[in-house]
Amino acid sequence: MSTRCITPFYKKLEVVNGVTTGYVPFPCGKCPPCLRRRVSGWSFRLVKHGEQTKSALFVTLTYNEEKVPKTKSGLQTLVKADLQKFFKRLRKLTNEKISYYAVGEYGDKSERPHYHIILFNVNHGIVEAAWRIDSVDIGHVHFGDVCDASIGYTLKYISKEKRIPTFNGDDRAKEFSVMSKGLGANYLNERTIKWHKRQIEERCYLPLKDGKKASMPRYYKDKLYKDGEKFRISVHMQKVSEEWADNLIQSIGEDNFNGKLAERHINEFRRMAKKSKQRQKL
């Protein structure tokens, strides 16, 4: 499935000497392929980050009936401060450097607020102790293994349709994500930096273990490349995109190309809408 942005915006770029180079497309960040690219980038960063830590846990935090927060109108709601205080208590209970990627969301059926966390460098006992106040449980703690499935489950928030508010007077807090700074920074070392810089235009991607390639997140691009190098990459990607389109037009004709492109765009958004409806029915 393609990760090429289907609704890009264009910027007019100029070379240092003032010569206008034309317009170069930039990803919109909102279409289905862009969202898939974000998920892929975060998945890579979390896997890489886990390679340098002592432990990794997939944690779900829920509220007891008497502890669940409620809005002024009586609706059960997420409270970001509860999660932040949880991390603060965690840090007090250990000398290890804790890092995390966390989301707050509502259950598809019950709409109860809960939190999913990919949590590094803590053990089960400390997590359970931190989800208590004055030795009283705030709710239940569920543990799972950190794997492709649990990372994907946590990251589904990125491509999930934002549902709050769902009706007039819905005063619940919106679903959210929070994360530690520098997740996956360990990927960039002397060897990998040299590899990427050796062929700047051709190696602006992440090599995966199965030989496939993943789009490079902006986090790595900003650390790897200077503005001039980013410009070279943008021009190169535009050229590759134009060559791909020209070859396809020569193969199937311009009318068929435009028809297939429009059909692809429509199907991408249909798939995204269908997934959203399926989540609401679960």
Name each model feature, range by range.
Residues 17-19, 51, 62, 73-74, ...:
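Intrinsic-disorder/low-complexity loop/linker signature
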Residues 29, 57, 100, 141, ...:
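A broad, low-specificity signal marking well-ordered, structured residues that form hydrophobic/aromatic
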Residues 33, 61, 104, 117-119:
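Hydrophobic side chains in beta-strands
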Residues 38-109:
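Signature for HUH/AEP ssDNA processing cores
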Residues 97, 107-113, 117-244:
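Conserved His + Asp/Glu catalytic blocks
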Residues 238-282:
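C-terminal non-catalytic accessory extensions
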